[in-house]
Amino acid sequence: MRLSSAQHLLHDLDGAAAPYRYSGSVRRAVLTAKYHNAPWAAEELGVEMAHLLFGSEVVMRGAEPLPRPVEGYARGYQLILPVPPSNRRRGYNVPERMARPLSAALGVPLRTDLLLRVCSRRKQEGLTLEERLENVANAFQTAHPEQLENKRILLIDDVITTGATISACAHVLLQAGAESVYAMAFATVEPAPAASNTSPPSDGHTTPELSALDPAPEEDDLFDF
C-alpha cells in the first residue's frame, strides 16, 4: 500500500509504501525480529517485501527463504540505506537485515555507513506525534556526502508509524545532495489525523501527494517503483 502525505509525515520523501498494516500476525512477526534475538526473522521480512513489493520469486535453500533477482528491474534506485538503530544493545539492526534480501533481489548496493544516528534518545514507541518529531530532531547525520550526491535512495525501516523518523532521515540525505529518497517498511500503523498539520522543514523541498491508503494488501498487488 502506498502511504499518503495527508495521513503520514512524508516530508522530503518522494513517497513511501508498506505491504501490511501493523496488527495481528504482522505485528507479532515484527516483534519477533526486534525483541527475540532473531536476525533471521528480520531477513524473512525483507524476503516478503521483495516478493510483495517487487515481484521477486521466493525460493528455498534448505529451510531458508531467498528472493530471486527481479528480472528487468530498471527503476533506478542506486543505493539502499537502512534506518540506523536506536538500540545498539540488540546486536543487529532490524532494517539492515531486512534490506539484505531487497538488495539481493534488486541488485542495488546496500550501505550502512552513509546514514548514521548521532544521538540515542527515547524509543519512538508510545510517543505522541509532537514527541516523535522532537525525539528525532537532529538525530541523524550523513557520512561521505560525495557518495550520496545525485543518488536515488531507497530507505528501509521495519514499521512506519507517523513518518517522523523516515522524514528526518530523508531530510539529511537531501541536504547531503541526494537526488531523491523513497521509503519502504514491512508495515504501517493506522495514521493519526493530525500528521498532515505539522509543517515540514523549510529548506525548499516538497512532498508530492500520493493516493490514499489501500484497504488491504494483496499478494498480486505489486508496485511499479
Task: Locate the predicted segments by residue.
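Glycine-rich phosphate/pyrophosphate-handling loop used in enzymes and phosphotransfer proteins
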Residues: M1-I156, T161-F225
